[in-house]
Regions:
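Conserved GNAT-fold acetyl-CoA-binding loop/helix
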Residues: 35-58, 67-71
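Short helix-to-loop capping/linker segments positioned immediately adjacent to catalytic or ligand/cofactor-binding
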Residues: 59-62, 109
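Acyl-donor (CoA/ACP) binding surface of acyl/acetyltransferases
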Residues: 1-38, 73-186
Length: 186
């Protein structure tokens, strides 16, 4: 399905839309921060790498397993880019997607991530027809854990030392919800 048919998505305070070339500076601002990447098992990218990464997301397909739909999250009152949400096709055959999100820490603590992720999960179930949507989170990322728990996702797994960055092993939690569970949640 062409994203143009269901975008932008408007919530009470936010707009989820395709990234635009004019978003590069704000995108780079949070994508080069250590405090953003500490739970992503990677070092912040260089300025050149951010530009390459940004150019790729502008034209990224969303049709096959592994493809990712990344949406800019802006405040509706001033169009400030505050982060992004994503849906990654985990299995087209099994109708499963992974939800993810990255936000500028300057805007944390205001419920924006919860509001945006709620809209993205709803898009996944109601418009795109997924059966199951899951999130993979670093076990130490308490803010992110709070987001998925507030949304009613169920903790399904605790993966022990399943990823490594900078010589340090990290644990991950898997949270998920099914379409029927999401439909019956408040």
């Amino acid at each position: 399905m062409n994203p143009e048919t269901y975008l932008p998505i408007k919530t009470d305070r936010l707009i989820l839309r395709k990234f635009q070339a004019a978003d590069l500076a704000s995108y780079a601002d949070y994508h080069t921060r250590d405090d953003v990447y500490r739970f992503l098992y990677a070092a912040p990218p260089s300025d050149d790498a951010v530009k390459t990464q940004f150019a790729a997301l502008l034209e990224a397909p969303f049709e096959e397993d592994g493809d990712t739909l990344r949406l800019a999250v802006t405040r509706s009152d001033d169009d400030t880019l505050i982060g992004e949400v994503l849906l990654k096709i985990a299995s087209k055959a099994a109708l499963q997607a992974e939800v993810g999100y990255v936000f500028n820490p300057d805007f944390s603590g205001k419920g924006y991530a919860t509001e945006a992720v709620r809209a993205m999960i709803s898009l996944g179930f109601e418009t795109l027809g997924y059966h199951r949507i899951f999130a993979r989170l670093d076990a130490l990322n308490h803010g992110s854990i709070g987001v998925v728990e507030r949304l009613g996702l169920r903790k399904e797994a605790h993966l022990i030392e399943n990823d490594r960055f900078g010589g340090t092993w990290g644990d991950e939690f898997i949270y998920a919800t099914l379409k029927r569970e999401w439909a019956s949640s408040p």
